[in-house]
Amino acid sequence: MIEIVSSANPKFKLAMKLHERRGRQQQQKILIDGTREVRYAMQSGIEIETLFVSNSVLAEQIEHVTELVNLTAGSAFYLAQDLFDRL
């Protein structure tokens, strides 16, 4: 997993735009929060493009996160906790 520590990172900026309706419509993407919700989305046939993981989630749910990373068609990024909290 690649670590993102700067809010200037293009992937992080793109994710932040998804907080607004306009950003979601322009990009035709949504944010899904939580390992359980990501799993439900995948079971429903939604392709996960990017997975963001925080250090606290990684520490608490390492097996679930590892499984999700392996099943994700896109990329997985480890976010610094302050950035993850902003998402």
Identify the role of each PLM range.
Residues 65-87:
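Glycine/small-residue-rich loop that forms an oxyanion/phosphate-binding "nest" at active or ligand-binding sites
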